Amino acid sequence: MIERFSGEAGKRLRVEALTGQKLVGGDKGLAAELADMAELISVKAGDVIIQQDGTDNDLYFIITGAFDIVVNATPIRRRFPGDSVGEMAAVEPVQKRSATVSAAADSLVAKITEQQLSELGSRYPDIWRRMAKELSKRLIERNQFVNAKREKIRVFVISSAEALGVAHLLQSMFAHDKFLTVPWNQGVFKVANYTLDDIERELDQCDFAVAIAHGDDVTNARGTEWPAPRDNVVFELGLFMGRLGRKRAILMEPRGEGVKLPSDMAGVTTIPYVYDEKNDTEAKFGPAATALRKHIMSLGTIS
């Protein structure tokens, strides 16, 4: 089977197969780059490509065959062509593998490294949103999401390190409201050293997630730099959106700066803001805080 997809002669089939991958989302440009860089690997039935608690962080796209996902020696799911495996460790390189992945049949996979994924993500930022959607579905599969109703609304604030000033301003303006505002760096995540387990714990606790796009964040789109949320901000907002729903996952974006969002973020609740660190900071930011406050109070806690 691997011969069919190998070399220049097999490139058309590689591109076709990769275009159909969930993380690729039909993007032929992304599929073509993947076809050039990915390593094709033939896997025999019973062979293991990922070992639970392993420290590798490659990402695998399933081209043919099927793979069992095994946690603590118990098979829990089966993945098929179009699926990918290894996303969690690829997104958080210091995290150990959370499951074993073994071939249920003779299979073919395309492997890329974490570094290659990061490089692709800088050119095709939609891949982070798609990955977040897939991981959200897998979190739902675990069926651990029944929470007791909270007495106090909890609002979790996502941002890049560069936008922490905006996050802290929002927290201070909500100091006397009947809800708790928690920026990501205050006892939730450690800077540049958190895992998806940390995110999942916060998913279970919060009623709203507010992601702050910052004008200093940029991405390169067709050779032009555009303001855009950082990859981790888009990724985390996608996870919270998958759990909480679009009304409870809110994006705050700088007013008038033409922020570029992944195309499949359409429909996310957005609130524009003005942040002037030097002049009338609270007065200029106030309308955005008021709009967000009204939105939060209208929905309340999750039942």
Swiss-Prot record:
EC category: hydrolase
PROSITE patterns the record matches: CNMP_BINDING_3
Gene Ontology molecular function, alphabetical: NADP+ nucleosidase activity; nucleotide binding
Residues binding a nucleoside 3',5'-cyclic phosphate, per UniProt: 22-138
Entry coiled-coil feature ranges: none
Compartments, as annotated in UniProt: Cytoplasm
Claim: Ribosomal protein is one of the keywords in the record: no
Catalytic activity line of the entry: NAD(+) + H2O = ADP-D-ribose + nicotinamide + H(+)
Keyword terms: Antiviral defense, Cytoplasm, Hydrolase, Nucleotide-binding
Top-level taxon: Bacteria
Location of region: TIR-like: 154-273
Single Gene Ontology BP annotation: defense response to virus
SMART domains assigned to the protein according to its UniProt record, in alphabetical order: cNMP (SM00100)
Regulation of its activity: Activated by cyclic UMP (cUMP) and to a lesser extent by cCMP.
GO cellular component: cytoplasm
Record comment regarding domains: Has an N-terminal cyclic nucleotide-binding domain and a C-terminal Toll/interleukin-1 receptor-like domain (TIR) that probably has the NAD(+) hydrolase activity.
Subunit structure: Purified protein forms large 2-dimensional sheets when incubated with cUMP and shorter filaments in the presence of cCMP.
Role according to the record: Pycsar (pyrimidine cyclase system for antiphage resistance) provides immunity against bacteriophage. The pyrimidine cyclase (PycC) synthesizes cyclic nucleotides in response to infection; these serve as specific second messenger signals. The signals activate the adjacent effector, leading to bacterial cell death and abortive phage infection. A clade B Pycsar system.
Protein name, UniProt field: Pycsar effector protein BcPycTIR
Organism per entry: Burkholderia cepacia
The encoding gene: pycTIR
